[in-house]
């Protein structure tokens, strides 16, 4: 199963514009050269994309308590913010937070588990490779996995190699 995700740094903290307004503008200028390669910055917003088993790119978003994947972005600002993420350091681990909802991503504890969103923080390890791929692993060794159609990402036993990775 492919576990490739992209974390693309969108922009630093914006004081006067809404996140969704800036997101639409910034996303249009993002290139593959903008992907994160080994460092996460505070006050930076990200989109997370993954490749499904049919080699189609999907963008992760919070769909009211469950992480989903979409092959396109919404056109309204309210929905767009659910596609934007931050990564917050919690010592030696990371918490993945959705900007639109403020909820934290929680990977399941076994293969095929749904990826939920909640108020509870889950510590995740980030493993980078030199090509901009990152594996997000929870304490049970589960990583995000795209299903064949990409609509419902789940968890699967991950590795710190490109085949078990996402691009951020």
List each language-model region with its residue ranges.
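Lectin-like carbohydrate-binding module/patch detector with strong preference for beta-trefoil
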Residues: 21-168
């Amino acid at each position: 199963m492919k576990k490739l995700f992209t974390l693309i740094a969108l922009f630093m903290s914006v004081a006067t514009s809404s996140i969704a307004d800036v997101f639409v503008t910034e996303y249009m200028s993002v290139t593959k050269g903008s992907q994160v390669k080994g460092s996460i910055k505070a006050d930076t917003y990200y989109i997370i994309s993954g490749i499904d088993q049919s080699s189609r790119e999907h963008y992760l978003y919070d769909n009211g308590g469950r992480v989903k994947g979409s092959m396109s972005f919404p056109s309204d600002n309210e929905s767009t913010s659910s596609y934007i993420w931050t990564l917050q350091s919690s010592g030696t681990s990371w918490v993945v937070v959705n900007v639109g909802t403020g909820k934290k991503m929680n990977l399941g504890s076994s293969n095929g588990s749904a990826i939920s969103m909640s108020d509870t923080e889950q510590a995740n390890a980030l493993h980078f490779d030199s090509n901009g791929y990152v594996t997000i692993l929870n304490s049970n060794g589960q990583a995000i996995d795209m299903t064949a159609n990409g609509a419902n990402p789940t968890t699967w036993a991950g590795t710190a190699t490109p085949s078990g990775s996402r691009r951020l």
